[in-house]
Amino acid sequence: DEFNSTDLGLQWQWHANYNELWGMPTCNGCLRLYTADLEHPATATTDAVAYRSLWEAGNLLLQKLPARDFTATAKMRFASKEDNQYGGIIMMGMNYQALVVRRVGEKFLLQQLHCKDADQGGAETQKTLATFKPTAKDTIPYSPAVYLDIYMQMKVKDGYCRFAYSLDGKRYKDAGDVFALRQGKWIGAKMGFVSERSNTKGNRGWIDADWFRVSH
């Protein structure tokens, strides 16, 4: 998907009923996905919700796998307004694994997120793989964003997935552990984008995905 239309392609499916605050394709030729809250404080009518995994994250934008063996590559710019906002790509199912960049201070951490038995309340683990300096920074005084341009890739073969990344779109480096795909509930495994924040204060960040391409 080149995201050159303001209509989202029919191959894409949200992980829950759509909320317009999650994002949409833009007239600038990219898909914008805003970071969504992973934790929710208690209110007068609801209890606090603590984070365990992305199983309950409704704003995952996913599509079904196109073949047994394939490579999917995304070109994106991640913009962060606050610490602990992150975005990237994910292979989603009852077990899942994601490759994301997370803002910490004035740098970005490349991280592997992994969860086993997410549907049963399994807790997510995080592994830091690399550290990057921002590609660009806002100069505005109010709530400036820092940006990272990155290419992310997943290679699937015989039921296993290997993630990789590149900063120039030419030289890719393997990232994290090989992951065995597992189906979702009532559906097969799905792949796509993740954009979240664990700090619910301050302004949201976002992913601008230029394209998501699949090759066989």
Language-model segments: what does each one mean?
Residues 1-216:
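Extracellular glycan-recognition regions
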